[in-house]
């Protein structure tokens, strides 16, 4: 299969080594900037447990991480309300990390299933916006 030849075949030792080398967990010590992770709890490609692993590894290293989880999403955010809320989080997150302005969240979280297990403090206005939701 083309996919396995490009990213690694977990059924072979060579493939396992390739997957390990490409895994963010292998390189967590090299992450030096805040990270935003958006995850669908029902993602069949990137399991929630994998996102949980990188979040935990970053927390152990005291690397700032914001973890946004959507319990009703899979790979990619299909529900418009969830997409809108993630765009709002991303805009504020990037504003804090890179500088510049962002549109304060208004109704961006209405109807969204967004949860933020960790890192809410790295996104300006997120705590307040979710409290109004």
Model-derived regions: residue spans:
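Active-site-proximal cap/loop segments of hydrolase catalytic domains
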Residues: 1-133
């Amino acid at each position: 299969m083309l996919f396995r030849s490009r990213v690694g075949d977990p059924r072979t030792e060579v493939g396992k080594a390739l997957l390990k080398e490409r895994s963010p967990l292998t390189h967590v010590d090299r992450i030096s900037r805040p990270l935003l992770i958006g995850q669908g709890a029902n993602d069949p490609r990137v399991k929630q447990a994998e996102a949980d692993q990188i979040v935990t590894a970053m927390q152990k290293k005291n690397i700032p991480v914001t973890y946004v989880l959507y319990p009703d999403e899979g790979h990619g955010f299909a529900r418009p309300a969830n997409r809108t809320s993630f765009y709002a989080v991303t805009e504020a997150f990037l504003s804090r990390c890179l500088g510049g302005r962002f549109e304060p969240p208004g109704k961006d979280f209405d109807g969204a299933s967004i949860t933020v297990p960790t890192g809410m403090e790295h996104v300006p206005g997120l705590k307040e916006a979710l409290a109004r939701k």
